[in-house]
Amino acid sequence: MDRLHIIGAGLAGSEAAWQAAQAGVPVVLHEMRPRVGTFAHRSGDFAEMVCSNSFRSDDDERNAVGLLHWEMRAAGGLIMATADRHALPAGGALAVDREAFSGAVTAALRAHPLISVAEEEITELPAEGHWIIATGPLTSGALAESIRAVTGAESLAFFDAIAPIVHAETTDIRCLRQSRYDKGETEEERTAYINCPMTRDQYEAFIDALLAAEKTEFHAGETAGYFDGCLPIEVMAERGRETLRHGPMKPVGLTNAHDPATKAYAVVQLRRDNALGTLYNIVGFQTKMKYGAQTAVFKMIPGLEQASFARLGGIHRNTFLNSPTLLDDQMRLRARPNLRFAGQVTGVEGYVESAAMGLLAGRMAAAGILGRSLPPPGPETAMGALVNHITGGAVAKTFQPMNVNFGLFPPLDDARGGRRGRKDRYKGYTDRAKEVFTAWLAAQA
């Protein structure tokens, strides 16, 4: 039987190896640590949690990441089973003892009879064989260059230029829908943007808050240089109080239907971020403000006072593919179908999301080697919604890493509005997802 080779023993690679081996496929897991280290990792253990010890909410009834936990447990995931065994008290969240967790994952993989570990750095994309690349945001320079050569110069990013993403349903009716200069051939195109106009006083107060907000510093190993194309908004504001008004907040080409005679002093634009139209990103608002400061400052924008954020902004090093243009729904590189990608390098963000994509990639690769066909789970599920987002549901031109959230799910037919309705709707999402995911697993039995 052919072997499956996996590059990277992070959360995605570890889960992919486990799933494939459990399906009966021999696996070679290639990991460069501890021989070649990174500035972030502290050990040679697998599935090392670098940034925090939290897998976030464990509520599988009304939280999208909790639902993802449920799906991974249902699928026999190694990462979730190990996390449960090494869980710490954390309220409604799932947090783990990091060292015990990664040590246990390492022990389980090394003990599996179908998994062999090769402690070596892979510097080029292999031309033959079955491979999963799960090298994460700190992909080594040599391999990153090989990926860039195969996928194209614009396909691999080395810094996130992350703008905040808002749940569209939480924007206020005062916000107006219009493309700048009414550009577009269809009504949908001409109303593609949500616009939030500001008076001069509102703009000045916003700039004051932006300049005073607490910012994060670059981590060790990150360059402090910025690309002009993705300057943080606070850096732009530091260059002059009017800079933003002549940049992403310029008020030209837009009219206020509520008050046509009054011109806005500045305008914040939100652009659709997914095909469903449930998520919008704040255009040009990449930032390194701390999360608490972001929420306070961005809620000063007229119409966003009650906004719910699917993701807050940030700029930090992250190697990821423009997956919607490169990967098929089997997570294979279209140009080289023997190569699958999994984890954070595909453009998902978060420990759980990365491991979930590893779970899918491992199962899909094993099915292919065994001569079977395995479609992804439906987009009604958390895993299916994520893989759909990274392989076609997202807008390729503005693609950025994404956490799982209900904005990625197809809407429910009988959803109600309001706070109480939102809780019922989330429960509706999870009930539907569990039914669809259970059927997907049963079809593989």
From Swiss-Prot:
Catalyzes the folate-dependent formation of 5-methyl-uridine at position 54 (M-5-U54) in all tRNAs. Its EC number is 2.1.1.74. It is found in: Cytoplasm. Its cofactor is FAD. Gene3D superfamilies: FAD/NAD(P)-binding domain. It catalyses: uridine(54) in tRNA + (6R)-5,10-methylene-5,6,7,8-tetrahydrofolate + NADH + H(+) = 5-methyluridine(54) in tRNA + (6S)-5,6,7,8-tetrahydrofolate + NAD(+); uridine(54) in tRNA + (6R)-5,10-methylene-5,6,7,8-tetrahydrofolate + NADPH + H(+) = 5-methyluridine(54) in tRNA + (6S)-5,6,7,8-tetrahydrofolate + NADP(+). It comes from the Bacteria. It holds the Pfam family GIDA. GO terms for molecular function: flavin adenine dinucleotide binding; tRNA (uracil(54)-C5)-methyltransferase activity, 5,10-methylenetetrahydrofolate-dependent. This is Methylenetetrahydrofolate--tRNA-(uracil-5-)-methyltransferase TrmFO. Keywords: Cytoplasm, FAD, Flavoprotein, Methyltransferase, NAD, NADP, Transferase, tRNA processing. SUPFAM superfamilies: FAD/NAD(P)-binding domain (SSF51905). Belongs to the MnmG family. TrmFO subfamily. Its main location: cytoplasm. GO terms for cellular component: cytosol. GO terms for biological process: tRNA methylation; tRNA wobble uridine modification. FAD binds at G8, A9, G10, L11, A12, G13. It comes from Rhodobacter capsulatus (strain ATCC BAA-309 / NBRC 16581 / SB1003).
